[in-house]
C-alpha cells in the first residue's frame, strides 16, 4: 500500500536556513531528508532531538524581520552607566542603540548617569526612585531591556541571603516590564554568587521567570563571564543572561574570550591631570606603616604569617579573614575585584606606593573613559564604581548581540550554564 504523504511548510530565518543547508551538505543529505529524520526521531520520543532544531524551525510561525536603525533601549537598576556607556559606543552594520529611559534609586548615581550617558539624548527619561514605587505599566516601551538587578543578597562578599533578602526579589520588576512590553531582547546581569543563593533555587526561579516571560518567551544563553579573559584589567566575574524573543528564531552565542590579559599597571598608566575624581584617599600614619610591610600582591595576613609585620600593626580579627584586606595589587596581573563597599582595608591598594587607589584609578580598572565624571562624595563615588559593569566588557557582549540579530557569524564558545529555548524551562 503506498504511503500517504503531505507537505509541511516551514518559515525560518534566512541565516538559520543557510546554516541548516550547509549542515545538510556536510552530512551529504537533502534538507527534506534531514527534516524527516528529525520528525521521525521526535515521534520516537527522543525529545533531545528537538533541541538540535533551530528555534522556530518546528513552529511553523512566521519570523518577524528586523528593520535596520536605532534599537530603543531601557535600563532598570542602571548604576552609574557601565552598560549605558557601552550602549552609546556600540554600533553594527544595521543597528545602534538609543536610550528611552533608565532608573536607579540612588540620587548621586542617577545624576552621574544623566550627566554622562544621557548627555546626547535629552529626551530620554531618568527615573530616580525605588523600583518598588515605580509604575511599571506606565513606563515607555523599548526594543531592548537591560537590567542588573541588585546583587546585595546574591554576592559572595559577606553573607548571601538570596531570595530571602531585602533585594533578592527585585528581579521580578524587570520580568513585569518584559511581560508587558515583549522587547526583542533582554540583558540581565548579576554576581557570581547568584548560582549558589538559596541552594541554587534563586537562579532556577529567575531563569524560569525570564525564559517564560512575555507572549513568546525568550531563548536564553546563560554564561559566567570572567572579564579578565576579555582584556578587562580586573578579575570580575558576572552571570549574564542574554534573552532573545522566541519568535525571532535566533540564539545568542557567547563571544570567544580574547585570551589576552591586561595588567593593572598598564591600565593605570598616563591618567590625565584633567580627569575628575582623582582625590587621594587619606591614609593614617598607621595604615601607611602597615602597607610598608606588605609586598606586591600580598594581603595583611600573608605579611603577618611571614613574620615581617610588627605586632602593633597586626589586626585583631577573629573568624573568617577576607583575602582582600590591605591587599596590594600585583602590577603584572589584572586587579582583583573592585568592590563598592567595605570598611578599613578594602579600598584596593597600590602595588608599590603606601596608599589606596583613587576613585579615578578604580574607574580605570572598570574601563570607564577618563572624561566620565562621577557625581557625589568620595564614598558615594566609590560605591558607584564598585557596583558597575565594566564598560568594555559590556560592549563586547553588546557587539555580539547585534551580530546575532543581524545573522552574522562570530567566534564563540559554549556557555558555562547553557542555552534554554523559549518557554521550555521550569523550576524544579
Predicted regions mapped to residue ranges:
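Extracellular structured ligand-interaction cores
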Residues: 70-73, 236-238, 333-335
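C-terminal target-recognition/interaction regions appended to catalytic cores
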Residues: 288-428
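Short Lys/Arg-rich basic patches
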Residues: 1-14, 21-29
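Short, well-ordered beta-strand micro-motif
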Residues: 114, 240-244, 339
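Class I S-adenosyl-L-methionine
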Residues: 134-142, 152-325
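RNA-binding accessory domains that recognize and position tRNA/RNA substrates
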Residues: 48-65
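Short, basic amphipathic alpha-helical segments that act as recognition/interaction helices
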Residues: 27-52
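Core alpha/beta nucleotide-donor-binding catalytic domains of modification enzymes
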Residues: 60-182, 192-196, 201-204, 211
Amino acid at each position: 500500500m503506498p504511503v500517504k504523504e503531505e507537505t509541511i511548510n516551514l518559515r525560518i530565518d534566512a541565516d538559520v536556513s543557510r546554516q541548516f543547508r550547509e549542515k545538510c551538505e556536510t552530512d551529504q543529505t537533502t534538507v527534506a531528508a534531514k527534516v524527516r529524520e528529525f520528525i521521525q526521531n521526535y515521534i520516537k520520543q527522543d525529545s533531545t532531538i528537538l533541541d538540535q532544531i533551530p528555534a522556530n524551525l518546528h513552529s511553523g510561525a512566521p519570523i518577524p524581520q528586523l528593520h535596520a536603525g536605532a534599537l530603543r533601549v531601557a535600563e532598570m537598576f542602571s548604576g552609574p552607566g557601565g552598560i549605558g556607556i557601552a550602549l552609546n559606543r556600540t554600533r553594527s552594520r544595521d543597528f545602534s542603540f538609543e536610550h528611552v529611559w533608565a532608573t536607579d534609586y540612588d540620587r548621586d548615581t542617577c545624576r552621574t548617569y544623566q550627566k554622562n550617558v544621557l548627555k546626547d539624548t535629552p529626551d530620554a527619561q531618568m527615573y530616580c526612585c525605588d523600583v518598588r514605587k515605580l509604575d511599571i505599566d506606565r513606563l515607555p516601551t523599548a526594543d531592548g531591556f537591560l537590567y542588573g538587578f541588585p546583587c546585595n543578597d546574591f554576592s559572595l562578599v559577606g553573607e548571601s541571603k538570596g531570595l530571602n533578602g531585602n533585594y533578592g526579589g527585585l528581579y521580578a520588576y524587570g520580568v513585569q516590564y518584559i511581560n508587558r512590553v515583549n522587547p526583542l531582547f533582554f540583558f540581565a546581569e548579576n554576581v557570581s554568587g547568584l548560582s549558589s543563593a538559596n541552594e541554587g533555587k534563586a537562579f532556577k526561579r529567575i531563569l524560569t521567570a525570564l525564559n517564560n516571560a512575555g507572549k513568546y518567551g525568550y531563548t536564553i544563553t546563560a554564561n559566567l563571564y570572567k572579564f579578565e579573559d576579555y582584556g578587562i584589567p580586573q578579575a570580575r566575574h558576572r552571570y549574564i543572561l542574554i534573552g532573545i524573543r522566541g519568535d525571532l528564531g535566533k540564539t545568542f552565542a557567547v563571544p570567544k574570550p580574547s585570551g589576552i590579559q591586561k595588567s593593572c599597571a598598564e591600565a593605570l598608566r598616563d591618567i590625565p591631570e584633567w580627569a575628575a575624581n582623582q582625590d587621594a584617599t587619606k591614609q593614617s600614619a598607621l595604615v601607611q606603616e602597615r602597607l610598608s610591610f606588605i609586598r606586591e600582591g600580598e594581603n595583611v595576613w600573608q605579611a603577618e604569617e611571614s613574620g615581617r609585620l610588627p605586632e602593633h600593626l597586626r589586626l585583631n580579627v577573629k573568624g573568617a579573614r577576607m583575602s582582600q584586606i590591605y591587599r596590594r595589587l600585583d602590577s603584572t596581573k589584572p586587579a582583583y575585584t573592585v568592590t563598592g563597599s567595605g570598611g578599613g582595608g578594602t579600598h584596593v591598594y597600590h602595588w608599590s606606593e603606601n596608599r589606596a587607589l583613587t576613585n579615578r584609578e578604580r574607574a580605570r580598572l572598570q574601563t570607564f573613559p577618563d572624561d566620565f565624571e562621577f557625581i557625589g562624595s568620595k564614598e558615594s563615588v566609590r560605591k558607584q564604581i564598585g557596583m558597575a559593569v565594566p564598560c568594555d566588557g559590556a560592549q563586547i557582549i553588546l557587539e555580539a548581540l547585534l551580530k546575532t540579530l543581524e545573522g552574522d557569524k562570530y567566534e564563540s564558545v559554549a556557555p558555562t550554564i547553557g542555552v534554554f529555548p523559549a518557554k521550555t524551562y521550569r523550576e524544579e
